[in-house]
Amino acid sequence: MEAAAELQIPVLVLDRPNPIRSDIVEGPLLDLNFQSFIGKYPIPIRYGWTVGELAQKIVAEQWIPAVPSLSVVSMEGWYASLWYDETNLPWVKPSPNIPDVGTALIYPGMCLLEGTNVSEGRGTDHPFKWFGAPWINGKILSQELNKLHLPGVVFVPRSFTPISIPGVADKPKYENQLCDGIEIRVITRNKYQSINVGVSLSLIHI
């Protein structure tokens, strides 16, 4: 939109659903002192808006240096509590490591751990659902996490070996090394709190 504004080109957004519902919001607002390419606006981690609603908010709040002429074509037959897999629309990966709605739900919390020395499952068939490292005891970690009784989720021990996958995971953490850890198994997605899970994982000491 910034480039369109600079070139005086109108922007037309054909709105699409937020894949993990629009009526659930999680996480703190971004501190703009830590603004980056992956976090640009003062919005929660799981912000809930559709792409059209986000575009309208960016323009209304003037979060970019120049704002374009924006038009949003609204959806029909959509409501905020719909999951993407309830829309009958084909799934298009928003990222190579988000292959399905289940991963999209888990991602907002697990992405907080990408900068750590623990594998977030890249280089496996279950990115962000698996979490571990060669020095972790998955049995103990799963037991400690399950003691927290976090809503909508159970944690089970999981061993895995990350590998490079062309176009998906290039030299992932602990490539070709056996990692022990946990699998995040969502059992009630309407109750699952992604950010709470990510923060809880980061605070566990084993």
What is the predicted role of each segment?
Residues 35-107:
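Conserved anion/nucleotide-ligand pocket segment
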Residues 150-200:
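Substrate-recognition/cap regions that form aromatic- and gly/pro-loop-enriched pockets
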Residues 6-10:
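A short helix->loop->beta-strand "cap" motif at the edges of active sites that frequently abuts
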Residues 204-206:
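Conserved small/polar residues in nucleotide/adenosyl-binding loops
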Residues 12-34:
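Glycine-rich, charge-decorated loop segments at or immediately adjacent to ligand/cofactor-binding or catalytic sites
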Residues 1-2:
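Active-site-proximal cofactor/substrate-binding loop regions of enzyme domains
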Residues 14-17, 75-76, 133, 187:
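Active-site-proximal beta-strand/loop segments in catalytic clefts of secreted hydrolases
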Residues 77-158, 162-163:
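Glycine-rich, aromatic-lined ligand/substrate-binding cores of catalytic
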